[in-house]
Amino acid sequence: MLIHTKAIIISALKYGEADLIVKAYTLSDGLCTYMLKGVLKSRKGKFKASMFQSLTQLEIVANHRGGGKMEYLKEAKVTGNYQSLHTHPIKLAMVMFLAEMLRNAIREEESNEPLFHYLEYSFQFLDSTDKIANFHLLFLLNLTRYLGFQPEMGIKDLPVFNLLDGIFQDFSSNDYCIEGKNVDLLKSFLGTDFDALQYIKMNQTSRNDFLSMLLLYYELHIEGFRKPKSLSVLNEIFG
């Protein structure tokens, strides 16, 4: 079936001497994988390798067969050209980390329009802002809403957060209950917009600890989830 849709690049892997295998999250069909023949050698072809950098936003025309098969792109053009996302060194490190997180966390091969629009808006915001130190934390916390394990927000005044059940409670009931600074930060982040992130003050230690807590939360709720290899680079940059 010929599909016209928006897509966000998750990863691009070199295959052989000149081909790319590209994973993209599409508005029409969720996660899709494309084979791009000869893109790394052709100078006059309609596709350029730079179009498939992580988190690039595209409009594409593709043949979608479904069933987990490799799809084929017919046309692609970059939309919402980023001004700094792929050139600012700190943002580039964050792009690597977030793309790897998405690759490890998203399994859907079906349309999820709210998730697509969340990704689309988030990366446009990251491109436009210079207040980025805590962006990845709120991004990952909000992402849980679309993946089905958002923290329960009804009772936020309780002192303990149960990572296993995703709820606040007044006592520890298992080995995955946390309290203290990370719970206070979690309450601050919940309901916060990206443009208010600058008002959440964190130092190196608290930022790294909170991220470690989020990654554990992902591990508990996504079977087979792996921590990103780029995590150490991100921690070093924000250290």
Curated annotation (Swiss-Prot):
A Pfam family per the record: RecO_N
Keywords per UniProt: DNA damage, DNA recombination, DNA repair
Record organism: Christiangramia forsetii (strain DSM 17595 / CGMCC 1.15422 / KT0803)
Protein name per the record: DNA repair protein RecO
NCBIfam families the record matches: reco (TIGR00613)
Family, as annotated: Belongs to the RecO family.
A Gene Ontology biological process term: double-strand break repair
InterPro entries xrefs: ARFGAP/RecO, DNA_rep/recomb_RecO_N, NA-bd_OB-fold, RecO, RecO_C
SUPFAM superfamilies in the record: ArfGap/RecO-like zinc finger, Nucleic acid-binding proteins
Domain of life: Bacteria
GO cellular component, one term: bacterial nucleoid
Stated role: Involved in DNA repair and RecF pathway recombination.
Keyword DNA damage assigned: yes
